[in-house]
Amino acid sequence: RSLASTEFTYNQATVSGTATFVGDEHAALAVLINRVANLIAQRTRRGAGNWAVVSPASLTVLQSATTSAFARTTEGTFEAPTNTKFVGTLNGAMRVFVDSYASDTTPVLVGYKGSSEADAAAFYCPYIPLMSSGVVLDPTTFEPVVSFMTRYGYIELTNTASSFGNAGDYVGEIAVQNLSFS
């Protein structure tokens, strides 16, 4: 989340216009997500943001918004080791994931991932997926333990002195404040 160069705030208490009910105020979050996605397209010249990671509270807001075109997924569930799950699409183009462990005030993260592996904000490159040490004795407790090791490379291209320093252009963040469901 520290990579995001665009930061907006969704504050439900300051949503303008006359809302008929709370779902009208919730629609402003979907509009703001689209705004950040389009700013990503403007900065990268590649495409609009095509994925978002939201908290369970922000997901509820998207699901209850009146004019939002959020469609729940009918695909199988994707459970990552971090418990980030694919939950649906927004406006038919943006894949929405939920971080089940996120608090209600966790910002919405919007990003772009292109069709090639080099068209992204950051790169995770495992070159030894997982190695086991075998069973060894813990010297303090004398219990048998197994340790696992990995070797990998992770890079964010953030040096703005070169043309590769545009990783922050691929990601935007929306702070969430004063959510109300009534």
For every predicted segment, state its role:
Residues 1-28:
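Extended, well-ordered alpha-helical scaffold/bundle regions in very large, multi-domain proteins
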Residues 19-45, 50-51, 57-182:
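Sequence/fold signature of self-assembling virion shell proteins
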Residues 3-4, 52-54:
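Generic low-polarity alpha-helical segments
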